[in-house]
Amino acid sequence: DGRYMRSWLEPVPGSLSFPGLPTSRHYGIKPEPLAARRGDCTTFDTHTLSLSDLPCGSPPVDRDKQSHEGAFSENNGESEANGEKPHIDPNNPAANWLHARSTRKKRCPYTKHQTLELEKEFLFNMYLTRDRRYEVARLLNLTERQVKIWFQNRRMKMKKINKDRAKDE
């Protein structure tokens, strides 16, 4: 039903919108912090459209065209009849969930050097202290999170190998 979608995307007649202030229409939705609004490229671990999906330095109008071009070509016949495209505010979380893209990074395999060093470290110690994790990450040009997850996965692999070995005997 188009009326529910339109209520989020089109401004309510007679209402004013002030950037940075929540409006009465967005009950229970936490507004984004002002620091991450414009020009800041930060990474979020959420699965909604964030400013990190948009190119830095481009004006907000260009960003809007790039991220939402043709998004309503089949759903919004009323706007097409008028010859205008609906304006979608990239700072409005209520509109963004309709066009959410995953912000997950593509899978990037470790280099042979990184794998070798991680395996050596694992043979020496299956668990890393926070300081050692920081050091390994810095030496291998990885994030601490990547090192932490690699060690978690390696421990699970070890557990599986041991279980299979016990089953075979």
Swiss-Prot record:
What does the sequence similarity comment in the record state about its family? Belongs to the Abd-B homeobox family.
User: Which molecular function terms from Gene Ontology are attached?
Assistant: DNA-binding transcription factor activity; DNA-binding transcription factor activity, RNA polymerase II-specific; RNA polymerase II cis-regulatory region sequence-specific DNA binding
Tell me where in or outside the cell this protein is found.
Answer: Nucleus
What ranges does the record give for the region Disordered, renumbered to this chain? 52-95
Keyword Signal belongs to the record: no
According to UniProt, the name of this protein is Homeobox protein Hox-A9
Q: InterPro entries from the xrefs?
A: Abd-B_homeobox_TF, HD, HD_metazoa, Homeobox_CS, Homeodomain-like_sf, Hox9_activation_N
Source organism: Gallus gallus (Chicken)
Q: Which residues bind DNA?
A: 103-162
Q: Which Gene3D superfamilies match?
A: Homeodomain-like
Q: Which domain of life is it from?
A: Eukaryota
Q: Which Pfam families match?
A: Homeodomain, Hox9_act
**Keywords carried by this UniProt record:** Developmental protein, DNA-binding, Homeobox, Nucleus, Transcription, Transcription regulation
What this chain does, per the entry, is described as: Sequence-specific transcription factor which is part of a developmental regulatory system that provides cells with specific positional identities on the anterior-posterior axis.
Which PROSITE patterns does the record associate with it? HOMEOBOX_1 (PS00027), HOMEOBOX_2 (PS50071)
Question: Encoded by which gene?
Answer: HOXA9
Q: Does the keyword Nucleus apply?
A: yes
GO cellular component terms given for this protein: nucleus
Q: Which SUPFAM superfamilies match?
A: Homeodomain-like (SSF46689)
Its GO biological process terms? anterior/posterior pattern specification; DNA-templated transcription; embryonic skeletal system morphogenesis; proximal/distal pattern formation; regulation of transcription by RNA polymerase II
